[in-house]
Regions:
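Sequence context surrounding c-type heme c attachment/ligation sites in exported
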Residues: 28-60, 66-151
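N-terminal signal peptide c-region/cleavage motif recognized by signal peptidases
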Residues: 17-20
Length: 151
């Protein structure tokens, strides 16, 4: 019982400390973190998109692995859009900060579709997996059209 309590207290302390660190993070650091998360999302989603489009041979093991990474990564960038980060040069459009409800919906949609892909990828149904890859791509693209500046 003592061990469980120690683990619980330690976990809560780390959770609170990580929140405090995030709250104190400088805007430029937050922007770099969100950009890194988005880069990794692209890295792990890209091959799956290629498979869904028939440009790359389908590989169920790669899809399952990448879908798991994508599910975790889809949760990471959003804290990087904190107040104050709009002053840092990036491709985030002003709408990210002025229409926060719509932006949050878009982020939530990506997370939900990525979670579905991670689940579907374990089933082995190639057609269902490719359809879900398309749904993830649509979630990504929908956000990019509204909230990201063109290069």
């Amino acid at each position: 019982m003592k061990k469980i309590l120690t683990v619980a207290v330690t976990g809560c302390t780390l959770l609170l400390a990580s929140g405090a660190v995030l709250a104190q993070a400088k805007p430029d650091v937050l922007v770099k973190q969100r950009q890194a998360a988005m880069t990794l999302i692209g890295k792990y989603f890209g091959p799956m998109g290629g498979m869904a489009q028939g440009k790359v041979p389908y590989n169920a093991e790669v899809v399952a692995r990448n879908a798991g990474f994508l599910e975790a990564l889809s949760k990471m960038p959003w804290d990087g859009f904190a107040p104050g980060t709009q002053e840092i040069k990036s491709r985030a459009l002003p709408a990210v900060f002025s229409d926060t409800a719509k932006f949050k919906e878009a982020g939530d949609r990506l997370q939900a579709e990525a979670a579905k892909l991670a689940s579907v990828s374990k089933g082995g149904d190639e057609a269902a997996i490719k359809a879900q890859i398309g749904a993830v791509g649509k979630a990504c693209g929908g956000c990019h059209e509204t909230f990201r500046a063109k290069q």
